[in-house]
Structure formats: structure tokens, C-alpha cells
Regions:
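Short N-terminal secondary-structure initiator segments
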Residues: 74-80, 133-138, 170, 210, ...
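Short, structurally constrained coil/turn elements
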Residues: 57, 161, 221-223
Length: 252
């Protein structure tokens, strides 16, 4: 299975966070091939469409190929409109030079199986991790990639390709409220730096009550690792909804 963390190690996770961390968000397969065509066959778990996600972002595939040192978009694996079995071309009609490929997995679904297909006789081999360092990002739907058009368009993935850094996406849409289990996950995770998008979901009261303990728990295991906290975004849903505006204003 392509899961972000071993959820069995964290029984204190809520059912929603457990489900989200089984998703393949931010995970990618790196390989080399000289094939002119690349296809994929994959199996997902959920059948219901997402309310704020494209079908490709939710359970499709997103391929990039390195050209002149840069990752360039190459194609998508479009999933079936219903069901959990998917098969589709990802890119076709290429030349036969050897290519380094980066295939992102779905943002909002769990992958039960994945097969990558090439032309008969074409070489297909695993490639080494192309990214240096390890930056772990824990956050809200913004980090998770909600409303991104494709799996590779979540900001953690975009930064990874642009900077050459390895970003680990631990976003949990709507759930990241400085809970102690997120602090435990960070404390037990190897990282060169942490980025926290942890002010978007909680209330001002939750931030006041939880932030100090959250940081203390992580610092016990990572005394010198950079902890980078992002400011919450401005929610345009509060342009006219006074309750939502007050909720956000209280955090500033």
C-alpha cells in the first residue's frame, strides 16, 4: 500500500485523520524508461467523488519528466468516472531517448495497487531519489492539496520540483488543529526542517491553549531542527459572512 505513515503506530488519531493518512498524497514513483508510451493501471479504495477536488487530483496520476535539469509536465492518468479500477495512457508518442520520470499518486484517495506499462521490450527501471534534504510539512487542506488541479500541483510538490528538496506532505484537510498526535508524529519523524500550516483550522482559543505544548513536544526530539510556522490565509468566505470573518480575525 502507498500510505504516508503507518497509522497503526498512532491509535490516537481520529478516524478522519487515519483515513487521510492512508491516502497517497505527495507520494511519487521515480523511474527511467526509453519507452515511447507510458500507461498505468491502478486501484483506488474510495468511490465517492470529492466536493472540492477534480477527478484527476482526487484519484488520478500526474507525470513529470526531467528535461534540461527541470521537471516538465508530461501527462496525466485520467481515472474512471466511477469505480475503483483505472487504466489509462499517461503520455504517448515520445522519442526513444532515456527519460527520468516522476509520477505523482492521487491526493485524495488510497492506492491499493499500481502498475506502470511501457512498450514491449523497452527498459523500465527504478531511479534514485532525485531530491535532497527532507522537509516535512504538516498542515490543513492548503497543504493537503485540496482544490489543486492535479496531484503534482499541491504546493509541497511544486516547491520540491522547483528547489530540488524532498518535501513530505502530511497535510490533513480540515483536521490540523495543533493536536498532540500531530506533535508526536513530528517528534518521531526524521527531518531537516519542519513547515507547519497549523493556524488555518484551529480557533484562536485552540491556538492559545495548544501551541506552546505542541512546540515543546517537538523540541524534545528535535532541539535544533528549524520549525517554520506559516500564517493563516485570508478566507474570502468571510467577505460577507460575519461569523467566519470574526473567526479568522481573532487569530491575527
Amino acid at each position: 500500500a502507498f500510505q504516508r505513515i503507518d497509522v497503526a503506530r498512532y491509535p490516537e488519531l481520529t478516524p478522519t485523520v487515519t483515513r487521510y493518512y492512508r491516502y497517497s498524497t505527495g507520494l511519487a514513483v521515480v523511474f527511467r524508461t526509453e519507452s515511447r508510451n507510458i500507461r498505468a493501471r491502478w486501484t483506488t479504495v474510495n468511490q465517492l467523488p470529492g466536493a472540492n477536488s477534480t477527478l484527476i487530483a482526487q484519484r488520478g496520476l500526474d507525470l513529470y519528466i526531467r528535461r534540461d535539469g527541470k521537471w516538465v509536465f508530461a501527462g496525466v492518468g485520467v481515472p474512471s468516472k466511477s469505480g475503483t479500477q483505472h487504466e489509462a495512457p499517461v503520455v504517448e508518442h515520445m522519442d526513444t531517448t532515456m527519460k527520468e520520470c516522476l509520477l505523482y499518486l492521487p491526493l485524495h484517495d488510497e492506492i491499493a495497487a499500481l502498475e506502470i506499462g511501457t512498450d514491449e521490450g523497452a527498459l523500465l527501471e527504478a531511479a534514485p531519489d532525485p531530491f535532497r534534504h527532507r522537509i516535512v510539512v504538516i498542515g490543513s487542506s492548503i497543504t493537503h492539496g485540496t482544490s489543486a488541479s492535479r496531484p503534482g500541483m499541491a504546493y509541497a510538490a511544486r516547491l520540491g520540483r522547483a528547489l530540488g528538496f524532498g518535501f513530505v506532505n502530511l497535510g490533513a484537510s480540515g483536521q490540523c488543529k495543533l493536536d498532540t498526535f500531530f506533535a508526536r508524529i513530528a517528534a518521531e519523524t526524521r527531518a531537516d526542517a519542519f513547515v507547519f500550516d497549523t493556524f488555518s483550522n484551529p480557533s484562536a482559543q485552540q491556538i492559545d491553549e495548544r501551541l506552546e505544548g505542541f512546540v515543546r513536544r517537538i523540541r524534545e526530539s528535535h532541539p535544533t531542527t528549524p520549525l517554520i510556522f506559516l500564517q493563516t490565509e485570508v478566507r474570502e468566505s468571510g467577505n460577507f459572512d460575519l461569523k467566519k470573518r470574526a473567526f479568522e480575525d481573532a487569530k491575527r
